[in-house]
UniProtKB/Swiss-Prot annotation:
SUPFAM superfamilies: Protein kinase-like (PK-like)
NCBIfam families (UniProt xref): PRK05231.1 (NF003558), thrB_alt (TIGR00938)
Catalysed reaction equations from the record: L-homoserine + ATP = O-phospho-L-homoserine + ADP + H(+)
DNA-binding is among the record's keywords: no
Coiled coil: none
GO terms (BP aspect): threonine biosynthetic process
EC number annotated for this UniProt entry: 2.7.1.39
Pfam families: APH
Originating organism: Rhizobium johnstonii (strain DSM 114642 / LMG 32736 / 3841)
Protein's name according to its UniProt entry: Homoserine kinase
Pathway note: Amino-acid biosynthesis; L-threonine biosynthesis; L-threonine from L-aspartate: step 4/5
Family: Belongs to the pseudomonas-type ThrB family.
Disulfide bridge positions per record: none
Length: 321
């Protein structure tokens, strides 16, 4: 979450009259994240999250995101729920941006997750994959294998500002992944961004998943690889196999991975590491000065990518083969 667009209090109060949300008591911007402008609202009824959708988010995708939250919530997954306007629509407009009010989810994200938390995340991810079955809308993953080369080309000329010699390495990686990317694996709705700051806990109990604005249709095991990258590396760059084992056991307690998915995990993990390196690189080079947004280091994911290149067997992630 982040703030790119400021809002005037009078405009916000007028916006709230279109909802059964009570009267505004206070609001503040939320700096974490990189995609949309987000605000925490306290009203005379319930706390809410106000999201203004910025230019990177296609307005045509919003029915998918908001409808998915409704679909998952109706099937028992703990996640935020869009608040409908008085006219029944889920989407309004504020400060020249499409805007929505979303229910506030109790909990906090973990700064230092442990293996027991990784197990809960794995289980919740699998529950989401199962609950997503039957969702009628479709959204291709624009940030998967077919989109990476174009994304790299946007940053390639300046990549040397981050680390010298990146051009040859990333070009070679793109060539490898284009040839090795698996097909025919189980697919469905994936979260595609289930980082620690998108999972809330109350104590050690997972209380819900948030931020579905990268959700799309893709390989389910690719979503697993994103979580391994996001949750199972330590700050020094080392892969924590205890966390990896816990996450994979948690996932498979709900939805066992097929042999083909397990075999593909090293390639998928290289791909998901490259995906986040590329988007972080682009944001690092292009985020405007003064934006209330937390930029994230692209080199963290370059190091993870290099780790995955050395993997000889999926067992090295913590799988029992």
């Amino acid at each position: 979450m982040a703030v790119y667009t400021d809002i005037a209090e009078d405009d916000l109060k007028w916006f709230l009259t279109e909802y059964d949300a009570g009267t505004l008591l206070s609001y503040k911007g939320i700096a974490e994240g990189v995609e949309n402008s987000n605000f925490l609202l306290h009203t005379s009824k319930d706390p809410l999250i106000l999201t203004l959708y910025e230019k990177r988010v296609e307005k045509s995708d919003l029915p998918f995101f908001l409808g998915l939250m409704q679909h998952l919530s109706a099937r028992g997954l703990s996640c935020p729920l869009p608040l409908p306007r008085r006219d029944g629509a889920l989407l309004g407009s504020l400060s020249g941006r499409p805007a929505a009010l979303i229910s506030f989810l109790e909990g906090m994200w973990l700064r230092k997750p442990e293996a027991k938390h990784c197990r809960e995340v794995g289980r919740a991810l699998a529950e989401m994959h199962v609950a997503g079955d039957g969702f009628a809308l479709k959204r291709p993953n624009a940030l998967s294998i077919d989109g990476w080369r174009g994304l790299w080309e946007k940053s390639e000329a300046r990549a040397g500002e981050v680390e010298p010699g990146l051009r040859d390495e990333i070009r070679s990686e793109l060539d490898f992944l284009s040839a090795a990317w698996p097909s025919g694996l189980p697919a469905g709705v994936i979260h595609a961004d289930l980082f620690p700051d998108n999972v809330f806990f109350l104590g050690d109990q997972l209380s819900g998943l948030i931020d579905f604005y990268f959700a799309c249709n893709d390989l389910l095991a690719y979503d697993v690889s994103i979580c391994l990258n996001a949750w199972c590396f330590e700050k020094d760059g080392a892969y924590n196999i205890t966390k990896g084992t816990a996450m994979l056991e948690g996932y498979q307690s709900v939805r066992p991975l097929s042999d083909a998915e397990i075999s593909a995990l090293p390639v998928l993990s290289r791909g998901s590491a490259l995906r986040f390196f590329l988007t972080r690189l682009y944001d690092w080079l292009t985020t405007p000065e003064g934006a209330m947004v937390t930029k994230k280091d692209p080199l963290e994911y370059l190091r993870k990518l290099r780790f995955h290149r050395q993997i000889k067997s999926p067992a090295e992630y913590g799988l029992s083969l």
